[in-house]
Amino acid sequence: AVRSRAVSIGKALGLPATLLDTVADAAAWHDVGKVDPRFQAMLWDGDRMSADLAAEPLAKSGMPAADLTRRRRALRASGLPHRARHEAWSEAVVERYLADQDSPYEGDKELLLHLIASHHGHARPLLPPVHDSAEHDLEAIIHGKNVQAPLPREVPLSSADRFSRLNQRYGRWGLASLESVVRCADMTISAEGS
């Protein structure tokens, strides 16, 4: 749904096909990092067993947004580290997926990874540092392929260089506009309950 919405927005803005494909892929894969078992437990109201038994990973919790006490309790019970960002995990999974492919990504790989990492407004240029002592890998499925990626252990300072190159390539406002396509698609689909 988010991919389709991003395509609609991108077409309305007149994005060229190759750029539209990259934006669409970012929109499709922006939440793959939510497969982290701790994140799933948080979405399942802190219930790790329900999260482990679920047939599919959740993208959103069923908790009322206004019930902050319940949300905080679920967060504590999940074991997620303070300030953890699923965007970092999504970027790591997609980067591993692309590395495992037989041919290089046809679009702008740097833009793709940046749009995934920045879809909640962070990663401009860096995601916040998180101390995460967990030992598990992230396991996701993209296009029917199992992808296993290690948890990010540090803030990749190379993201700042990537951000600089993307600003040179697309311009400050151009890059911000591309980010807003993914963010707007995600937010509007979420608001509609899809």
PLM features: residue spans?
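Accessory helical-bundle/CTD segments and flexible terminal tails appended to RecA-like ATPase motors
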Residues: 1-5
